[in-house]
Amino acid sequence: MYVLQEINPGITS
């Protein structure tokens, strides 16, 4: 998920 990385940097996968 890349969109989620924008709002949640904890998910880098």
Curated annotation (Swiss-Prot):
<protein>
    <recommendedName>
        <fullName>Unknown protein CP 12 from 2D-PAGE</fullName>
    </recommendedName>
</protein>
